[in-house]
Amino acid sequence: MYVDPMNNNEIRKLSITAKTETTPDNVGQDIPVNAHSVHEECSSNTPVEINGRNSGKLKEEASAGICLVKKPMLQYRDTSGKYSLSDFQILRTLGTGSFGRVHLIRSNHNGRFYALKTLKKHTIVKLKQVEHTNDERRMLSIVSHPFIIRMWGTFQDSQQVFMVMDYIEGGELFSLLRKSQRFPNPVAKFYAAEVCLALEYLHSKDIIYRDLKPENILLDKNGHIKITDFGFAKYVPDVTYTLCGTPDYIAPEVVSTKPYNKSVDWWSFGVLIYEMLAGYTPFYNSNTMKTYENILNAELKFPPFFHPDAQDLLKKLITRDLSERLGNLQNGSEDVKNHPWFNEVIWEKLLARYIETPYEPPIQQGQGDTSQFDRYPEEEFNYGIQGEDPYMDLMKEF
């Protein structure tokens, strides 16, 4: 069923219980989905306006994430040189940013649609994002989960690096949230539950995501989520000191430059739930530095329409006391999943995608439909140039 996202009353008032079908759509299959905007990176603490939202990011100000205890490293899948530009047709631009673009492409071999993320090497080096770029490739080469984007391969020329990703037709959760203004409690709960399972999976592999927000959550053709943009994701078995993220969502321990662990994702998870329910984040201020002050010191307040269980969960996620933050305690993500707000969620069914979604994107053209993405001016691209590459040693894995 399709619904009008402009009308909250028409979003399905779902109870998060199982579908009646014996098998869910696309389970066990590779779903051809997902593209996302290349978000701007800040060269200072000044926020950048993207899609009408203050979504500036902080650059890395420490050299590398520091792990205090050595653990066996993850096994990365080799993705380099798996494809070349000649394997695809570039159809249109899906998103732009200071690093490059995301294009809708079509394979010349199997006819399927993909998203091609292009990043300019010169800009990556200039903005000191080499480590983040390499980490993004590494983390995406590890993960495999129903609610996380899939990267199929990478390649490069002398000026760009390229990542071939799933194309997700349904667009950003951010767009749906802005059209809806805010989500009813059951709808926010559905998306939060799927995000919770994705975070649980990442943390089981000692991966911190560090940039959870509606812009980085895509909806597939059936309305299930796909977390994308792993530009700040990192393998951290213990703690790290890297300063990065999106201001409204950054945990206080990151703002105060203290060592931190996976608990920062659970803080951001709480902020995400709050924004879905309220339509705004709890500590927002048009002045970014004031936002940071609010994160460190302001009282967490709730609109009167928040369900009591939602308030209780958010108090236990958006807490500065790490010894009380859900997800960071002895039982990890189980404490979050067992909270009363999630009582009716059947987690096994949700993971298997048996649960009916509250919203199905109005995709009319099938695979390759771009109606849920903004239009961008198309330019002449100098892709595929071979020649002297001063940055080859910095991005060998592409």
Swiss-Prot record:
Catalytic activity, as annotated: L-seryl-[protein] + ATP = O-phospho-L-seryl-[protein] + ADP + H(+); L-threonyl-[protein] + ATP = O-phospho-L-threonyl-[protein] + ADP + H(+)
CDD domains reported in the protein's UniProt record: STKc_PKA_like (cd05580)
Active site (catalytic residues): D211
Domain AGC-kinase C-terminal: from-to ranges: 343-398
UniProt keyword annotation of Nucleotide-binding present: yes
Molecular function per GO: ATP binding; cAMP-dependent protein kinase activity; protein kinase activity; protein serine kinase activity
Enzyme Commission designation: 2.7.11.11
UniProt note on regulation of activity: Activated by cAMP.
InterPro entries assigned: AGC-kinase_C, Kinase-like_dom_sf, Prot_kinase_dom, Protein_kinase_ATP_BS, Ser/Thr_kinase_AS
Highest taxon of the lineage: Eukaryota
Domain Protein kinase: 88-342
Gene Ontology CC terms: cAMP-dependent protein kinase complex; cytoplasm; cytoplasmic stress granule; cytosol; nucleus; P-body
BP terms from Gene Ontology: G1 to G0 transition; mitochondrion organization; negative regulation of cytoplasmic mRNA processing body assembly; negative regulation of cytoplasmic translation; protein kinase A signaling; Ras protein signal transduction; signal transduction
Keywords, sorted A to Z: ATP-binding, cAMP, Kinase, Nucleotide-binding, Phosphoprotein, Serine/threonine-protein kinase, Transferase
Binding positions for ATP per the UniProt entry: L94, G95, T96, G97, S98, F99, G100, R101, V102, K117
Modified residues (Phosphoserine): S15, S55
Top EC class, one word: transferase
Family that this chain belongs to: Belongs to the protein kinase superfamily. AGC Ser/Thr protein kinase family. cAMP subfamily.
Note: Present with 1590 molecules/cell in log phase SD medium.
Name the record gives this protein: cAMP-dependent protein kinase type 3
